Amino acid sequence: MAGGAFVSEGGGGGNSYEGGVTVFVIMTCIVAAMGGLLFGYDLGISGGVTSMEEFLSKFFPEVDKQMHEARRETAYCKFDNQLLQLFTSSLYLAALASSFVASAVTRKYGRKISMFVGGVAFLIGSLFNAFATNVAMLIVGRLLLGVGVGFANQSTPVYLSEMAPAKIRGALNIGFQMAITIGILIANLINYGTSQMAKNGWRVSLGLAAVPAVIMVIGSFVLPDTPNSMLERGKYEQAREMLQKIRGADNVDEEFQDLCDACEAAKKVDNPWKNIFQQAKYRPALVFCSAIPFFQQITGINVIMFYAPVLFKTLGFADDASLISAVITGAVNVVSTLVSIYAVDRYGRRILFLEGGIQMIVSQIVVGTLIGMKFGTTGSGTLTPATADWILAFICLYVAGFAWSWGPLGWLVPSEICPLEIRPAGQAINVSVNMFFTFLIGQFFLTMLCHMKFGLFYFFGGMVAVMTVFIYFLLPETKGVPIEEMGRVWKQHPFWKRYMPDDAVIGGGEENYVKEV
């Protein structure tokens, strides 16, 4: 035994249901995954906009003034302004609050309705921002964008996990993260283009957020609902027909029976929130739905994603160079997510988590050291082109490690481990914890950089080390395991089995899903 680590047996185990991978289910999941464009576009656009001089002079003149007059005593503090950070981070407070409402809507009315509400809110918010004349309009727009993100991030990963066959669930679910990374890259490219405009480039950047919102709204009309959601609302025949359609087979009796068993168990739960917090058998789901989004944000990734242009500018990159560097990291993000799509259902979740964690630790330490050697604690100094290239290279290495590990798996794993009766509540916890810590990082990163200086990168590297150990000892492999049979995986884990009663296991057969290594 190596530290109690577990892996899947036979590709993850689980019942082998009838049917295969149909074009219909792949196209459905691709359309649904476009919900990630909302989140990704916002992550990418805000940092570029807040580095544009016209935007700063109109809404945040104090930041613009101190940047030009170099009033601050250190380069680390160039952009340290709470109101400026509130523009970026306010979205995530709204997303946090709306995720709880989205949980109830998703359970009662289906996953599609949540996607529709999210798209409409994001559309209205993008218009507020594009036509903003004061900071109040900007903040209101950001709050509406947050409602959109909260609804989309709550419903889309659940939708993808429920539609996809178990053997390719990871790859299809990561389509959501892929859409996020594409949204970030598109936003970075748009920011670079609009920064060349003589006037109102920031309005174009913020207003184009309406495009992914429209895609989301249209998608919510054309997508079918999931069999799980139909069963929750008593539509048994429609659920069977949909299952036959997405699996491409008439004989879906075994899988349909497991879904019905899970649905019957769900009906016995009057209050999913009370159960997930109080019943021991839901302890693994509660821990991972809370810990994984916390760890995902404490990697520091969103520092790179929505403050990349500001960060590169702080380090001495010229205006164009800072935006181009953000485009480069965005492109690395997209390509590396493709690696995850290829590997997640072949090699499993654990190996990606562990390798990506080690890669991020090394990268953060090197970046912190390079910045410390050039700027020290005073913040005085300049980057040579060679040092700037090395910093950019290791930031790209860090982004790559995140993009094939904590990025996609941070959404995939929580969405595939919760039984139906607590699934909306579990995903709401996942989204709300994610948004809360995204808010904290967004609101205080520039202040942390001002006070912790290059040591901030050591802080993030240390946190990645902690979470890598957490994954090694506590996360079993979930590759290829049907969602309705996750109870069997927890039952055979050396730590989590103490919380799992015999009736927590759904599904026939005596398959072993995990084994010690």
Curated annotation (Swiss-Prot):
This protein's record includes keyword Transmembrane helix: yes
Keyword Transmembrane set for record: yes
CDD domains: MFS_STP (cd17361)
pH-dependence annotation: Optimum pH is 5.5.
Residues in compartment: Cytoplasmic: 1-18, 475-517
GO cellular component terms, A-Z: membrane
The organism's place on the tree of life at top rank: Eukaryota
Regions that span the bilayer: 19-39, 86-106, 120-140, 143-163, 170-190, 204-224, 292-312, 324-344, 351-371, 390-410, 429-449, 454-474
Subcellular location per the Swiss-Prot or TrEMBL entry: Membrane
Predominant place of localization: membrane
UniProt GO molecular function: monosaccharide transmembrane transporter activity; symporter activity
Activity control, per UniProt: Inhibited by uncouplers such as 2,4-dinitrophenol and carbonyl cyanide-m-chlorophenyl-hydrazone.
Membrane topology of the entry: Multi-pass membrane protein
UniProt keywords, alphabetically: Membrane, Sugar transport, Symport, Transmembrane, Transmembrane helix, Transport
SUPFAM superfamilies reported for this sequence: MFS general substrate transporter
Tissue: Pollen specific (at protein level).
InterPro entries per the UniProt record, alphabetical: MFS_dom (IPR020846), MFS_STP/MST-like_plant (IPR044778), MFS_sugar_transport-like (IPR005828), MFS_trans_sf (IPR036259), STP/PLT_plant (IPR045262), Sugar/inositol_transpt (IPR003663), Sugar_transporter_CS (IPR005829)
UniProt family annotation: Belongs to the major facilitator superfamily. Sugar transporter (TC 2.A.1.1) family.
Function: Mediates an active uptake of hexoses, probably by sugar/hydrogen symport. Mostly transports glucose, and barely galactose, xylose and mannose.
Protein name as it appears in the record: Sugar transport protein 9
Species for this entry: Arabidopsis thaliana
Lineage: Eukaryota, Viridiplantae, Streptophyta, Embryophyta, Tracheophyta
Gene: STP9
